[in-house]
Amino acid sequence: MKCPYCGHLDNKVIDSRINKDATITRRRRSCLACDQRFTTYERLEVMFPMLVKKDGRREAWDRHKLVVGIEKACEKRAVSRDKIDEFVDDIEHMLQDYGAKEISSSIVGEWVMERLPALDEVAYVRFASVYRQFKDVDEFMSELKNLLDARGGGDD
């Protein structure tokens, strides 16, 4: 592993830790040339199905896109980055379990919509407003009513 400080290739691992679900190894390394320490992460490369967009285009799965979308929905909410990472990990596990080479992006979107209220209800409403592309206030209110009904808080 190349040292990010001096570019030297020789270093030693001084600590290794595996995350809770044994999918990522974090290693602390020390450069043998400059003695600087740095951290590397190893993650198993998993092949995810290709996403088929509404217009028929095919696109490779991009974890970062979902993370950014969830972060935007959770902006100024008490949702930690760890919780967001766990949420996206769960979606990725579902993609792995799907068992096909392609999946409609709308299926993935629905998975996100089904699980987001458990993470944060306000984030759900924010995400839904973009994902569902509400045309008017009535559609937005209908989605809010569905959320309230799902948690047993509807007034009807």
Swiss-Prot record:
PROSITE patterns: ATP_CONE. It comes from the Bacteria. A zinc finger (unnamed) spans 3-34. Keywords: ATP-binding, DNA-binding, Metal-binding, Nucleotide-binding, Repressor, Transcription, Transcription regulation, Zinc, Zinc-finger. It comes from Desulfotalea psychrophila (strain LSv54 / DSM 12343). Negatively regulates transcription of bacterial ribonucleotide reductase nrd genes and operons by binding to NrdR-boxes. Binds 1 zinc ion. This is Transcriptional repressor NrdR. Signal peptide: none annotated. It holds the Pfam family ATP-cone. The gene is nrdR.
